[in-house]
A protein has these predicted regions:
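N-terminal targeting or regulatory segments adjacent to alpha/beta-hydrolase or S9 domains
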Residues: 1-3
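Short, surface-exposed "cap/lid" segments of acyl-processing enzymes
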Residues: 8-65
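Extracytoplasmic/secreted proteins, especially bacterial periplasmic and envelope-associated proteins
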Residues: 43-46, 82-89, 111
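Catalytic nucleophile-loop/oxyanion-hole region of alpha/beta-hydrolase
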Residues: 69-102
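Short glycine-enriched nucleophile-adjacent loop
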Residues: 110-122
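Active-site nucleophile loop of the alpha/beta-hydrolase fold
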Residues: 129-133
Length: 133
């Protein structure tokens, strides 16, 4: 959150946590939503909110690297490596919010989700990958 606060993030484009219950504590399952290229967390709505309500799971909706920033040159610093690293970081955070991670993605988020299936450090692999498109 400190890093997010130092960046010129567009309003409502920051990463957020949706809690599956009124008590902010880890759940058995957690949903990690990875948005598509040049998109934001809103791309997956209302499916994400409905999923959280229906199954009472936590969800983490990160702002991927170089996305959601103000300015005409916001995406110029994006590379495949920093995009993938931001997805790996999101997976580590998701593992703190629940015991088993379900990844849902759209477009480029789907590609990142599949790549995370091989990620085994600091939190391990996701337990389920679901792609919208």
């Amino acid at each position: 959150q400190d890093r997010e606060a130092r960046l010129p993030v567009k309003p409502d484009n920051q990463g957020i946590i949706l809690w599956g219950d009124s008590v902010a504590q880890p759940t058995t399952y957690v949903l990690l939503y990875l948005h598509g290229f040049t998109a934001s967390r809103f791309e997956g709505q209302p499916i994400i909110s409905d999923f959280v309500k229906e199954f009472r799971v936590n969800a983490y909706l990160p702002r991927l690297a170089a996305h959601g920033l103000q300015g005409t040159e916001a995406m110029l610093g994006m590379t495949p490596a920093n995009l993938y690293n931001s997805a790996k970081e999101a997976l580590v955070i998701a593992h703190k919010l629940g015991k088993k991670v379900i990844i849902m993605g759209t477009s480029t988020g789907c590609t990142l989700a599949l790549m995370l299936g091989r990620f085994s450090q600091a939190g391990g692999c996701p337990d389920l990958i679901f792609t919208e498109y």
